[in-house]
Amino acid sequence: MIVPSLEELNSFKYSDLQNLAKSLGLRANLRADKLLRALKAHLKNEARKENENQDEIQTSASSCDEPEIQTSSQEQAEREPDDHVTKTRGRRKTVHRSPDSQANGNVQTEKKLPPVPNLQNHSEIKLCGPTKSQNQEKHENQVLRTAVEVPSLPNESQGDENTVSSGKHGIDGNEDPRVPSKRKKSLYTDGFSKPGKNKTASTTPNFKKLHEARFKEMESIDQYVERKKKHFEEHNSFNELKVLQRQPVTKGVPATPVPARGRLSVACTPGSQRRSQGRPHAGRSTLCVKGSAKRSALSAAKMNVRFSAATKDNEHKRSLTKTPARKSPHVTTSVNTPKGQAVLGTHKLKTTRGESVAVITPFKLTTEASQTPISHKKPVFDLKASLSRPLNYEPHKGKLKPWGQSKENNSLHEHVNRVSFHKKTYKQPRLQTREEQRKKHERERKEKKEKVLGVRRGLIIAERS
């Protein structure tokens, strides 16, 4: 797609701007002015990026030209007569000449005696030689640092084709000494940039490698389960400590005479006493079992959770279900006492109406007979004792209705009132309400039922229709 210039964008229609934004991957459902601004900003950014890329390509091309210039200067230095040079500069090894070549060289020097300016040239070459070799060494070190995959460069040897060097060049005699320079060139020309610089061209990442790395970082299912178990263990042990701290060691209520039969509450029946006796221990034991054997599951059934202050008014109500935080005041349990020594205070209150029924219990109390003597007489109501005992219900607050004013039966006056009402409002007839309709239906059903029963018993002769 051809990207328009910034001036052309002003003449575009809104639909064209939207299509352009969609093609560029921008948000298209904006207002016209905002969309135009966003497109201009995006195009400016793209143009700036392109300019930066071009500058980098130019710099990389110039950096590629530098090694070419160096290699060409080396070639020129090699082409010049180097008869007087017997040793290479820097770390290079000595060049041993064969006697034939030495003789030829002597003959040539005798024939061609170099003039004075040539000596100056030689001195210039000798002076320039070390600087060039130093630059070359630096360049080689850089290449060796950046390109690890490239093998170590073989030792170069300056000289003619018939010179033999000791080392690798002695084995590979056919190799050209200028091969490493080509390798260096290829290092730079392939990437179009120096090895130190990063490429700005966006490449697609290898998602497989990324996913594998992420997957290796993730913990396995077994590790996750172990971590969760440890977490639940700590949580459960903390909750158990809280529950044990919240349980107050309550004192037993002093023994009082039994109230009248009418005032016997649901909580004081023998069955409920048995339930309340067994319940705190059962609750504690279940908590312990859950804490030790099954740590991974949290049980919220026995926990007393108060979310707000709105539940405080229910504290004085004695519910049948005893949570760990709110137990019945009649049960006296101590944490240090064993299971057999748990004594119920309500046993002192209990007397049987007729004969005492023998109940088989695992822990029979022997001191019960001395505290509450069994009598066949009718118990006498004690007002003070009943008033001192806590109530099992919430008492009524506020004004009571006046005593003696009962609701009168107005069914006799209903017809008269209705007639008078209709006389007053004859111009606006009142619609039948639902309550009146219900009463009418109930009356009709009653009459129908009586009629059917009368026909069945032969009291009313069935009308033939």
Swiss-Prot record:
Give me the ranges of the annotated region Interaction with microtubules: 262-405
Molecular function (GO) terms listed? Answer: DNA binding; microtubule binding
UniProt PTM comment: Ubiquitinated. Ubiquitination by FZR1 may lead to proteasome-dependent degradation of this protein.
Q: Name the UniProt key words of this record, in alphabetical order.
A: Cell cycle, Cell division, Chromosome, Coiled coil, Cytoplasm, Cytoskeleton, DNA-binding, Microtubule, Mitosis, Nucleus, Phosphoprotein, Ubl conjugation
* UniProt comment concerning the protein's domains: The KEN box is required for the FZR1-dependent degradation of this protein subsequent to ubiquitination.
The family note in this entry says: Belongs to the NUSAP family.
Protein name (database record): Nucleolar and spindle-associated protein 1
What gene codes for this chain? Answer: NUSAP1
